[in-house]
């Protein structure tokens, strides 16, 4: 099933696109979809992960819900039609 990633700010720059569609299967997780994203856009991985761990300032959303805070993190199972998003830290002044 096609699953769309929406990428924001410098994450879109690293990927070269704001929207990337990956192929996922029933039972796949957010982490599986992220692995597929890194296959398409390998420059993203070092921006999203540090020493194999998700950087604390990166927000991973599934249908608008932060999977790290409100679901099962990268082990959250995907449903058909899910939209995923990666947000870098937001700062302002």
Could you describe each region identified by the protein language model?
Residues 1-92:
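Ubiquitin-like/PB1-type beta-grasp interaction modules and other compact soluble beta-rich domains
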């Amino acid at each position: 099933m096609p699953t769309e990633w929406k990428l924001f700010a410098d994450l879109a720059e690293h990927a070269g696109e704001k929207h990337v569609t990956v192929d996922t299967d029933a039972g796949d997780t957010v982490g599986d979809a992220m692995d597929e994203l890194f296959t398409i856009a390998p420059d993203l991985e070092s921006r999203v992960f540090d020493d194999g761990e998700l950087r604390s300032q990166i927000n991973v959303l599934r249908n608008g819900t932060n999977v790290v805070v409100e679901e099962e993190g990268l082990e959250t199972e995907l449903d058909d039609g899910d939209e995923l998003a990666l947000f870098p830290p937001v700062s302002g002044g």
